[in-house]
Amino acid sequence: MQLKRVAEANLPTPWGDFLMVGFEEVATGQDHVALVFGDISGQTPVLARVHSECLTGDALFSLRCDCGFQLEAALSQIAEEGRGILLYHRQEGRNIGLLNKIRAYALQDQGYDTVEANHQLGFAADERDFTLCADMFKLLGVDEVRLLTNNPRKVEILTEAGINIVERVSLIVGRNPKNEHYLDTKAAKMGHLLSE
């Protein structure tokens, strides 16, 4: 187990009250958070979203990506379902970090797509480690999920890590003129499924 569960508290939101559970990576001390809505115990698979940190989209309302739109839609869907989990995966910019993400944005402004920009900076298209999320699910006592994602790689990695993904639930929101090239690149070069 790469993580330990270290803290929890109630978190009221516009969609209802979630339980916020804090985790810490044993090796690095990096923190991650789960937002739990309702009773997630039992045999019924849990609706869940693994949401990677995106300061620009989640908190600064950037239109360059669909992250903030996905975060809001996922919390809303989980609350409507009456139970579910959002894992807030603290790997900013597909795990290249905030400053490198800003550098990647500058390269995108020069005409590179999101994958090419990462490569120009010496990174893979996606540096994230989703096995940490499997540990979070296990520490929450969940092993069967209906995963809110457009990314088949998340499904593969979580499945390989022992989480039974019984259904992939599309989360297609937030397309706009500022991010359509970004989304098209994610579909063409990273295999994201962006049509219903």
From Swiss-Prot:
The active site is at D126 (proton acceptor), R128 (nucleophile). Pfam families: GTP_cyclohydro2. Catalyzes the conversion of GTP to 2,5-diamino-6-ribosylamino-4(3H)-pyrimidinone 5'-phosphate (DARP), formate and pyrophosphate. It comes from Enterobacter sp. (strain 638). Keywords: GTP-binding, Hydrolase, Metal-binding, Nucleotide-binding, Riboflavin biosynthesis, Zinc. InterPro entries: GTP_cyclohydro_II, RibA, RibA-like_sf. Its cofactor is Zn(2+). The gene is ribA. Binds 1 zinc ion per subunit. SUPFAM superfamilies: RibA-like. Homodimer. GTP binds at R49, V50, H51, S52, E53, Q70, E92, G93, R94, T114, T149, K154. CDD domains: GTP_cyclohydro2 (cd00641). One of its GO terms (cellular component) is cytosol. The keyword Cell inner membrane does not apply. This is GTP cyclohydrolase-2. Belongs to the GTP cyclohydrolase II family. One of its GO terms (molecular function) is GTP cyclohydrolase II activity. Its EC number is 3.5.4.25. Pathway: Cofactor biosynthesis; riboflavin biosynthesis; 5-amino-6-(D-ribitylamino)uracil from GTP: step 1/4. One of its GO terms (biological process) is riboflavin biosynthetic process.
